[in-house]
Amino acid sequence: MSSVAPHKIVLFANTDWYLYNFRRSLALALRDSGHEVVLLSPPGEYGARLRALGLRWEPAPMDRRSLNPMGELRLLWWLLRLFRRERPALVHGFTIKCAVYGSLAARAAGV
């Protein structure tokens, strides 16, 4: 364990496949360093694999291909409520929609 105080860190991507294949090692390293890691993505078959590794994965109400304004507002509202409840120290979005919406919601939540 490092001498850095533990933080809650959110990793947000547009697929659970992406988190599993490209950010799994980061999530595990952060967790093993004492941080609380929350993974967010739309539902998929890899969410269960992430949980099986002992990681916390939450299914986000996101359609990565949609531009429906109501769906996008629903996602922003969901993220805002989640960030207010969880109070993460850091939100890191890996794809454009996740980076933009995650940043907007994090800012509004005071992250």
Question: What are the roles of these predicted feature ranges?
Answer:
Residues 7-10, 106-111:
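Active-site proximal beta-strand in glycosyltransferases
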